[in-house]
């Protein structure tokens, strides 16, 4: 585990594999004094937590973080750039929007974020080993899930509240029956069906 005496930001993204909606990233700076408290409250990789646990930890992280910020890349940007570059763009935005400039970033995965002014360390499965990355994964996941649930009210036939934009059987069937919406990623093969833009 990294020593957090410096101001180090953990950075992670969610939604890369979804068929619908933006890719969302978060950057989080945690103080040494709060890390153990958050770990004691169950903080870990967001994928290992229930929705209720994520919501509770999301609140604790927001209250206790030195700084945090969300970044997003739109469906248009995903289709124009590709999902990898859009994910890196969302992560870059989250870091650059922080109220405190971190001295270093710990980035989940194996890709460094382009055009950041500070050093970076990439960590595969970093959300399982680094508290600041785990915190970022939780903030990004909760923010994106809440957005998708709101969009489910506009597009109820795609079952977004349950699948969060990922390619469940019901979601794929709705794409076949109804075609994609403006929030579907047309560069993703399952979304390349007609009629377009309901």
Where are these regions (language model features)?
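RNase H-like, Mg2+-dependent phosphodiesterase core
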Residues: 1-198
């Amino acid at each position: 585990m990294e020593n957090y005496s410096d101001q180090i930001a953990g950075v992670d993204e969610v939604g890369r594999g979804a068929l619908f909606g933006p890719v969302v990233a978060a950057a989080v700076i945690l103080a040494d004094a709060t890390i153990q408290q958050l770990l004691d409250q169950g903080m870990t990789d967001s994928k290992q937590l229930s929705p209720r646990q994520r919501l509770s930890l999301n609140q604790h992280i927001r209250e206790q973080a030195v700084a945090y910020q969300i970044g997003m890349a739109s469906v248009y940007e995903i289709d124009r750039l590709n999902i990898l570059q859009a994910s890196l763009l969302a992560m870059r935005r989250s870091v650059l929007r922080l109220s405190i400039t971190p001295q270093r970033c710990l980035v989940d995965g194996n890709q460094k974020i382009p055009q950041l002014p500070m050093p970076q360390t990439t960590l595969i499965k970093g959300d399982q080993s680094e508290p600041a990355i785990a915190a970022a994964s939780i903030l990004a996941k909760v923010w994106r899930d809440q957005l998708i649930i709101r969009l489910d009210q506009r597009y109820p036939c795609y079952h977004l509240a349950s699948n969060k934009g990922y390619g469940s059987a019901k979601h794929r069937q709705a794409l076949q029956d109804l075609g994609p919406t403006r929030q579907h990623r047309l560069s993703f093969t399952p979304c390349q069906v007609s009629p377009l833009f309901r």
